[in-house]
């Protein structure tokens, strides 16, 4: 049995198809982030991009996501050193940090169902910008809250 590509290739040497397949489709990168102006610390919120389908955790207009007017960030090989802002479960970040993929990752399990069952996606856990009054009330990783 051959070694899976994510264990045998660096991110820089993956094909476009391999690169795209690393995304588990959790939807976490589609959550709005807030940055502390004093510390530059990034805080994730449960506020989703308006293009995110909260049931499927996928973009409603994936082919046009970079031109839709939303602030969708394209992950590229040139940005690997900056992947620390990505969720700690993100395959791009994990591989950039020489860490293994989680056991629920679709490349390991063959489907997204294990990821959803493990609670690692944003499925049915988000609100949309239009419903937000105070963004700070939606911070998920607030340092002063349990």
UniProtKB/Swiss-Prot annotation:
Judging by the UniProt lineage, the source's domain of life is: Bacteria
Pfam assignment, any one: CxxCxxCC
Transmembrane domains' residue ranges: none
Please name the PANTHER family in this protein's record.
UPF0260 PROTEIN YCGN
Family named by the database record? Belongs to the UPF0260 family.
Q: Which HAMAP family does the record associate with it?
A: UPF0260
Q: What is this protein called?
A: UPF0260 protein VP2169
Q: Which organism is it from?
A: Vibrio parahaemolyticus serotype O3:K6 (strain RIMD 2210633)
Q: What is the lineage of its organism?
A: Bacteria, Pseudomonadati, Pseudomonadota, Gammaproteobacteria, Vibrionales
């Amino acid at each position: 049995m051959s070694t899976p590509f994510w264990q045998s290739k660096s991110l820089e040497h993956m094909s476009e198809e391999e690169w795209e397949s690393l995304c588990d489709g959790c939807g976490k990168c589609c959550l709005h982030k807030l940055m502390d102006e004093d510390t530059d610390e990034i805080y994730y919120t449960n506020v989703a991009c308006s293009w995110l389908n909260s049931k499927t955790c996928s973009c409603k207009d994936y082919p046009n996501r970079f031109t839709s007017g939303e602030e969708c960030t394209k992950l590229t090989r040139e940005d690997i050193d900056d992947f620390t802002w990505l969720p700690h479960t993100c395959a791009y970040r994990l591989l950039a940090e020489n860490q293994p993929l989680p056991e629920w990752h679709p490349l390991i399990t063959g489907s997204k169902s294990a990821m959803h069952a493990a609670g690692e996606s944003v499925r049915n856990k988000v609100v949309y910008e239009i419903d937000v009054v105070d963004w700070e009330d939606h911070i998920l990783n607030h340092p002063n809250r349990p």
